[in-house]
Amino acid sequence: RSIHHLLLIAAALAFALAARSSGPLFRVHLPVSLTTLAMTAALWAWHVPALYNAALANMALYWGMQITIFATSFAFWLAIQRAGVMGAVGGLLGGMVQMGCLGALLTFASQPLYVTHALSAPSWGLTGLADQQLAGLVMWVGGMAPFAIGGLWIARRAWQRQNATGNSTNSINVLRELQAK
């Protein structure tokens, strides 16, 4: 499931990139802080064991989980694209930290949190706890990758803009430009 959720977040990024120049619906500017909080709330809420187990037992809740994770991630990636350098980096850092914390929580839990996976893990040759720890590691390490890649992309854009204006590329000027935005 953790890979599935990461794929939803990655798909939301792809759709947000495609929607950049689309119709007026996608031109709404939401603050990065709001979209970061919304995405964090959706991910963390759906990982509360009672909600997660309920979603796996009920098709309507399951699709609600998928839609809210995708929609909040889509809004987050749209906001990141439209934000200034500092806002985008802050949002990416916030997204990365919350993903890492959720992954670490799953990895270091002392007992399985999700009944469904604890019961199905033995068919894969894993204990319920080992399955959860593996999922936590995937979320912790793999889940932080899109945010890190986004940060590198933003830094590259900022440096390209700076080079286009003829400013020096030393680190002090880069920091001044980032603070000005």
Range-by-range predicted roles:
Residues 1-181:
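Alpha-helical membrane segments of multi-pass proteins
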